[in-house]
Amino acid sequence: ASQPVSTIQRYFVILPKKAHLESGFFHSLLKVWNIARNSGTKIEFYGNEKTIKVIEKIRKKVNIDASFYIFNDWNEMKRIFEKMKENDALILFMANREMVSFLPQMQEVPKYLNDHFRYRNYLLIFPSRKTKPEHEKLARDIGNADDFVEIGNIVGKIFK
């Protein structure tokens, strides 16, 4: 990074479709939440409708200064980058080829960052993944009321 983290005024967090289905998503999201809470920095989340709804529900339990935007086309990511100012930083949720949230456009991210973000702050997050049987056992469905309550309780305990 070319500038101190304390000078960042806003983080742009871009999430791929189905990011909320990754077994390590909530753990990774916790890292972003901690950045927002500890720095007081505004966070702008960009993701598809389902993923944004999951994050909005969590925000109701543990509030941070955040805005949410529906974003479905990773080919249009440059539009988000064009909104960024000098004191903004990027947090990009990524996925490996075997992960459910993987998008082919992710293969172009390193080159794009090298060409256009060389002197800007950015963070690439790869949520941890489990083998398929373990993933199925650990996966939570935010649409399931019991799972939602459990996720909310876990997040609430973490932030106490």
Specify the residue positions occupied by each region the protein language model found.
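Intrinsically disordered or low-complexity boundary/linker segments at protein termini
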Residues: 1-74, 85-91, 95-160
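Repeated scaffold domains used in trafficking and secretory/extracellular systems
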Residues: 76-80
